[in-house]
């Protein structure tokens, strides 16, 4: 996938996820999604170096009877995270 296509896809998924009132009401997840959206508006890929997205979506899932919007699942696959410990 070309970088610009990936950025556009991430933007669309975040926008769609934030349209969901349950997602919007989850403060931690919605703030993180807004950061991801802001990064994509600036034409950059969001790099989740703190690995915040997966735990935020997991907590959302637990709070909503293990139901997660498809947009969040697809977003997890697109957002880059570190694969290993990178040192100090």
Swiss-Prot record:
Keywords: Bacteriocin immunity. One of its GO terms (biological process) is bacteriocin immunity. The keyword Glycosyltransferase does not apply. Could impart immunity to carnobacteriocin-BM1 to naturally sensitive host strains. This is Putative carnobacteriocin-BM1 immunity protein. The lineage of its organism: Bacteria, Bacillati, Bacillota, Bacilli, Lactobacillales.
